[in-house]
């Protein structure tokens, strides 16, 4: 897993990894999470010598990378959508070239995962979910477009999370409208 807080917080609960192992019991799967909360598709905040000793993506040679981007970038609003798409294209090219699979040295398989929706909190100090979700939908659509251009698998978790949030209002799935709690993590994993 590579990307932002949505993926990074999957480390807290383990639902996704458990369901994957349960589904593919006959496979020897290893799931590693290299997501960081502030990561964006074009910005990964690391010290300049972060990979000097050991680059984790290179060390573990992923066959498949699930990419979780779009939420942080969505704060740029509609004006940032084109830049987001271009940065995604660039990132995919860099990952394909820099991190070949261990078994064949071919490019890893990629799965682009859309950003999740925002759950309404009722807190006047936090963004209104309806407004944020319009912005997020644009970035979901942009990620889908990049995936289609590249023939890459795309998973739309935006619609699923938005529907779940609407069905059970009142911060049932997040701690603050955008970071999933355990129930939200389980819902996303399923």
Features from the language model and the residues they span:
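Catalytic nucleophile-elbow at a beta strand-turn-alpha helix junction centered on a G-D-S/GDSL motif
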Residues: 1-12, 37-42
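Alpha-helical cap/lid subdomain in secreted, periplasmic
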Residues: 14-32, 39-190
């Amino acid at each position: 897993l590579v990307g932002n807080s949505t993926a990074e917080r999957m480390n807290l609960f383990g639902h996704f990894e458990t369901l994957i192992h349960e589904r593919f019991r006959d496979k020897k799967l290893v799931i590693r999470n290299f997501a960081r909360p502030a990561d964006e598709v074009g910005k990964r905040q690391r010290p300049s010598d972060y990979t000097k000793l050991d680059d984790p993506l290179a060390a573990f040679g992923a066959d498949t990378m699930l990419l979780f981007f779009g939420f942080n970038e969505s704060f740029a609003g509609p004006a940032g959508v084109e830049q987001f798409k271009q940065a995604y294209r660039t990132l995919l090219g860099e990952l394909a070239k820099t991190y070949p699979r261990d078994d064949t040295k071919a490019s890893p398989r990629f799965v682009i995962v859309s950003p999740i929706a925002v759950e309404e909190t009722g807190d006047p100090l936090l963004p209104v979910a309806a407004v944020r979700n319009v912005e997020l939908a644009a970035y979901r659509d942009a990620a889908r477009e990049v995936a289609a251009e590249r023939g890459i698998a795309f998973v739309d978790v935006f619609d699923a999370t938005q529907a779940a949030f609407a069905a059970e209002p009142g911060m049932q799935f997040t701690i603050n409208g955008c970071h999933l709690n355990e129930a939200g993590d389980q819902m996303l994993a399923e």
